[in-house]
Amino acid sequence: MPKRTLEDTELNPRDNYIKVSSKKSRKEKREKKSKDAEEPATDSTPIDIEVESKEARRERKRLKKAKRAQEAEEEQLPEGNAIESTSDADAAACIKAAKKAEKARLKALKKEGKEEKVDIPESTDSATPISVAPQQNGTTYTEDYNLSGLPQSEIDSFLTTNFITITDPLSASAALRPLIKFDYLPITDSAQRAPFKDFKAPTPIQAAAWPFLLAGRDVIGVAETGSGKTMAFAVPCVRYMSSLPKNQKNKGPRAVVVSPTRELAMQSYEQIVKLAKASGLECVCVYGGVPKDEQIRALKTADIVVATPGRLNDLINQGCADLSKARYVVLDEADRMLDKGFEEEIRKIINTTPSLGKRQTLMFTATWPESVRELASTFMTSPVKIAIGDNPTGDLRANSRIVQKVEVVEPRDKEYRLMQLLKQYQSGSQKDDRILVFCLYKKEATRVEGFIRQKGFRVAGIHGDLSQEQRTRSLEAFKSGNTPVLVATDVAARGLDIPAVKLVINCTFPLTVEDYVHRIGRTGRAGKDGLAITLFTEHDKAQSGALINVLKAANQPVPDELLKFGTTVKKKAHDAYGAFFKNVDTTKKATKITFD
């Protein structure tokens, strides 16, 4: 094929004219079509006409596309669902029939033992929607369907009857209902439900706290001694641990419970173990007075740690206890631990756990003083405060089910009067009734124990001079009833759950009225009535004013002999630092002062 030359490729004037003319004709045709579709304004320029024609084409394409989509949708619809063939009355009837069929299906599933959570539209006020709590700490709580169906009046009656006050800073969770029956607990394992078989219903603190704890919220529980606080935090703890993957179990503490005394730590441990074993969880109790080696070995595989603040802090400092993965932290009897001067140890322990927002922190206390409030504001995130009883402020108040009797006697007559009381309440059908006798000092407890034993009574003792093995043996003998009389110092006055204590005798009044309230709290537990008799002497007159206030607050009689000592209430003295103690934040550093 011959090559084309430049002359061949160049257009002559005629060819160029034909090409331009053809372009103009095509442009005129497009303009004519656009005029037929939409007549442009008389003053429009050629450029405006071209733009308008493009917009018209786009609009026509859009309308055609919408029409095709509508036709395709109408072809897919069945005749019964055609809008043109269904009147308003027919539509309402269809919706009603669908609701009825859905209810019947759910009822059949329930009979077969299946469970399905669905949202059914309801127009009546009888049904309450299932509320789901906010998620925190990786846990989720869904309210039981039967609990949601209860009328609100029944829930309000339960809260009012049991004097339950719930303060939630997050209004979104205020609708969580108390678990007034064990059936409403989200626990399907029969082994985990076994500890509740001897109880009719949860205690008020358990019923009110469980939904918030199961939802992963931080909770402050203010309730009197013997109200079931241990199981209140134990059940959510075990459920949280059970929800963890298997590869995260038995590889170090994921939950920690801090208690003020060895006895209380052991008591909490015994309750938690009952639930933990059913879920294959390891639990260890860490306290002082025994060798550390066995505790250190157990900590390596323990899932739940129950400990006293002193021993746990020692193990942390030695690098033997790692709480960096403990996302469930419980401070039991927080007010008592602060009174004993454990605030610094508590702060160090919590600082070794995950940060705020990554852990769930619980605080249970019998009172709500300023020191406990400051601690809660430091280590808790939007906590829900649950107060049980007619004392929502958490001020010091004795159990209203305990009958309090105060006898003013001469100091030299105390032992004689003590023997009269033991003979009165340890005779006949009351021979095996448990009586708890409190003394102020360890030497006094040893002397009173020997005096009672010489008079022929079965008695045991528990105080700081005894070894841990001796204290445990005495406590077990008293719980079993083999030794019906127990002489103790204030080491046993707080938190110990000793069932069926009929009588508490204060042979010597304690140093503070707070200790008095916790002493007598060993009786009248678990909803039962109790009796407390106090031998008051002139040596105790400094506490007369505070004692009178406690008696009046509980509607108990105040003897005239006690009123003679006066009603003045002295400033509370700190257990460790005396009356001139100043409560300061020990975590803050001092300001450096320079002199010119």
Swiss-Prot record:
Catalytic activity from the UniProt record: ATP + H2O = ADP + phosphate + H(+)
Annotated Basic and acidic residues bias: 1-17
UniProt keyword list: ATP-binding, Coiled coil, Helicase, Hydrolase, Nucleotide-binding, Nucleus, Ribosome biogenesis, RNA-binding, rRNA processing
GO BP terms in the entry: rRNA processing
Top-level enzyme category: hydrolase
The protein's Enzyme Commission number: 3.6.4.13
GO cellular component: a single term: nucleolus
SMART domains, per database record: DEXDc (SM00487), HELICc (SM00490)
Annotated Basic residues bias: 21-30
Region: Disordered, residue numbers: 1-87, 115-139
All residue ranges annotated as the Helicase C-terminal domain in the record: 417-566
Stated role: ATP-dependent RNA helicase required for 60S ribosomal subunit synthesis. Involved in efficient pre-rRNA processing, predominantly at site A3, which is necessary for the normal formation of 25S and 5.8S rRNAs.
Protein name: ATP-dependent RNA helicase dbp3
Biological source species: Sclerotinia sclerotiorum (strain ATCC 18683 / 1980 / Ss-1)
Upper lineage: Eukaryota, Fungi, Dikarya, Ascomycota, Pezizomycotina
Gene this protein is translated from: dbp3
